[in-house]
Amino acid sequence: MASTALSSAIVGTSFIRRSPAPISLRSLPSANTQSLFGLKSGTARGGRVTAMATYKVKFITPEGELEVECDDDVYVLDAAEEAGIDLPYSCRAGSCSSCAGKVVSGSVDQSDQSFLDDEQIGEGFVLTCAAYPTSDVTIETHKEEDIV
């Protein structure tokens, strides 16, 4: 009798093909959307979502030329350290000249620094601890002695 009940239950079951539920971007964790689409958001830029840019930063050091990739929201000194490049620094706050370099080509945003004056910035000096790349950039390092 048990076999009869089981066979009637199997016969009475209908198989309906279900379509997958649509996925909303809002249902994904923000980390997922960032990695999927190369997007980032943050309070530093008003909470807006912006496209992430990565630039090539070439360092001309006394030991030779070294190149790293650096996101536009990472200080060039931090990117160098992550790549194992040893560059000079002290305060890491843009308020001294230990990490000074000189931009040979390209551009950086160093609005976080408070040490260099407009004339020094105009001459191409940069504090690597407080500079974000805004394009591919080449920087001569170890320039603290050249700042007058």
UniProtKB/Swiss-Prot annotation:
Chief localization class? plastid
Q: Which SUPFAM superfamilies match?
A: 2Fe-2S ferredoxin-like (SSF54292)
Cofactor: how and how many bound: Binds 1 [2Fe-2S] cluster.
Q: Which InterPro entries match?
A: 2Fe-2S_ferredoxin-like_sf, 2Fe-2S_ferredoxin-type, 2Fe2S_fd_BS, Beta-grasp_dom_sf, Fd_pln
A GO BP entry: photosynthetic acclimation
Protein's UniProt keywords contain Transferase:
no
- What range is the organelle transit peptide? 1-52
User: Keywords for this entry?
Assistant: 2Fe-2S, Chloroplast, Electron transport, Iron, Iron-sulfur, Metal-binding, Plastid, Transit peptide, Transport
Fill in the subunit field for this protein.
Interacts with PGRL1A and PGRL1B.
What is this protein's name? Ferredoxin-2, chloroplastic
Q: What organism is this sequence from?
A: Arabidopsis thaliana (Mouse-ear cress)
